């Protein structure tokens, strides 16, 4: 729905959602289902944000590697909203790259016994950690770094490197010295116990499903509509101004956007300023490649052990390529000081896994320093519990949603959990609802 003018714009909109990514669409669907009038403002020409998928010659390109974690807030929100995410679990088999040597990836009992990546002592340590991980107290580990946890739990150098690689894989970050061990354990548990799915059609399937859920419930979605300012009044909000001069009256506003965008829309609020100032973005560089065929079918997954590298072919698991085609994501977790060197490193890994790939290359795309998530759950700040809350102390009527908001999960789990929380608060009257404790500002 793309309304540009007319009577539809003149009435009072109870809830305005700024941002049409996963969090914004989910929040809109929840609020509209509660019977509220909802308008979503998306500055781009189509909703989706970083969950958008580009379609080229039958290939479905996500913005870098995406996997939907099962058993967490994301899957529960999708189920509540009636969104079906079709896909499949990738195999646990693959290879580990340590130095210049490929080893069998220890992804199960047999591969654990046969891999040359780990010594016997290292295999015992990794097996023991995996068996006992479910008993770890994640709350008690909130202020412990993942690096310190690894050092405490395993002793052999190769086991430490491999465990670090598993944490990088499940959290999409290489800053393990800063990452809260509590948050990391939750992610790794979910990956090991519930698994992840590569989605048919890419993540556009989630965007399509959430958009349909919102529109079916009665929400309006305005594309090409950039929110410029929120008009505030005593005790709440009055309206949202759009960059083209339009004005939408509102009782509540949900900002489902990046931290700096939230600050620009809601300036002069100390709690929000503190959250934004302390946010640490999670970055990765990604090389996405479409091939007419897979040259070495057995080498579909490679995990870097001594370097934060990732290689995975998604089309053998999910419907993201034409018949026989291969869609490969190669990534380096972390900040890239030299983007040209990183691109060459990713191409070298691709050549190692699929020698001669250039002969069957259909499309390639390099995304340097892409934002994976807007805030790393830092041990120094107390992990997940220290992230921004949906309610902003000092800004009644304005709520937050996104992967940097709320105490639940990381990545899409955080986006959708915070969307549900923000929508539930947005539909309650300010005067009648039970007052929740305001989250403390970081510091």
Question: Over which residues does each language-model region extend?
Answer:
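A short alpha-helix-loop-beta-strand transition element characteristic
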Residues: 75-98, 155-164, 280-281, 296
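Glycine-rich FAD pyrophosphate-binding loop
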Residues: 32-56
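Helical element adjacent to the flavin cofactor pocket in flavoenzyme catalytic cores
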Residues: 186-238, 242
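Mid-domain catalytic core of redox enzymes
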Residues: 228-337, 389-390, 440-441
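Conserved FAD-binding subdomain of flavin-dependent enzymes
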Residues: 53, 58-89, 120-141
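Rossmann-like flavin
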Residues: 99-102, 113-185, 193, 197
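Conserved flavin/dinucleotide-binding core of flavoenzymes
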Residues: 314-443
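N-terminal Rossmann-like FAD-binding beta1-loop-alpha1 element of flavoenzymes
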Residues: 13-40
């Amino acid at each position: 729905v793309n309304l540009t003018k007319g009577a539809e714009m003149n009435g009072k909109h109870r809830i305005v959602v700024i941002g049409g990514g996963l969090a914004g669409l989910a929040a809109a669907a929840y609020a509209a289902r509660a019977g509220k009038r909802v308008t979503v403002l998306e500055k781009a020409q189509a909703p989706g944000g970083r969950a958008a998928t580009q379609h080229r010659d039958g290939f479905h390109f996500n913005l870098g590697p995406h996997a939907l974690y099962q058993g967490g807030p994301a899957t529960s929100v999708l189920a509540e909203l009636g969104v079906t995410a079709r896909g499949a679990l990738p195999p646990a088999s693959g290879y580990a790259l340590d130095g210049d040597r490929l080893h069998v990836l220890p992804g199960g009992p047999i591969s654990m016994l046969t891999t040359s990546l780990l010594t016997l002592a290292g295999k015992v340590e990794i097996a023991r950690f995996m068996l006992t991980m479910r008993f770890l107290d994640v709350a008690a580990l909130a202020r412990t770094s993942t690096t310190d946890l690894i050092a405490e739990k395993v002793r052999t150098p190769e086991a430490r490197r491999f465990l670090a690689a598993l944490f990088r894989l499940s959290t999409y970050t290489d800053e393990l010295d800063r990452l809260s061990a509590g948050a990391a354990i939750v992610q790794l548990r979910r990956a090991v116990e519930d698994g992840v799915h590569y989605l048919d059609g890419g993540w556009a399937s989630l965007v399509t499903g959430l958009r349909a859920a919102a529109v079916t419930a009665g929400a309006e979605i305005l594309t090409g509509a950039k929110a410029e300012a929120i008009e505030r009044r005593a005790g709440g909000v009055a309206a949202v101004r759009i960059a083209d001069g339009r004005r939408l009256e509102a009782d509540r506003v949900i900002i489902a956007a990046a931290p700096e965008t939230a600050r620009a829309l809601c300036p002069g609020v100390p709690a929000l300023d503190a959250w934004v100032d302390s946010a640490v973005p999670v970055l990765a560089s990604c090389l996405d490649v479409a091939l007419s065929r897979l040259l070495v079918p057995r080498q579909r997954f490679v995990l870097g052990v001594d370097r934060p590298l990732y290689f995975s072919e998604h089309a053998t698991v999910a419907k993201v390529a034409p018949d026989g085609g291969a869609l490969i994501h190669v990534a380096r977790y972390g900040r890239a000081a030299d983007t040209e060197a990183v691109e060459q490193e990713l191409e070298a890994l691709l050549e190692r896994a699929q020698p001669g790939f250039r002969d069957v290359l259909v499309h390639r795309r390099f995304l340097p320093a892409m934002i994976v998530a807007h805030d790393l759950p830092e041990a120094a700040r107390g992990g997940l519990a220290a992230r921004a809350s949906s309610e902003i102390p000092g800004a009644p009527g304005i709520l937050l949603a996104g992967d940097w908001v709320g105490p639940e999960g990381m990545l899409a789990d955080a986006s959708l959990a915070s969307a549900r929380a923000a929508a539930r608060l947005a539909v309650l009257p300010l005067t009648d609802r039970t007052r929740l404790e305001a989250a403390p500002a970081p510091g």
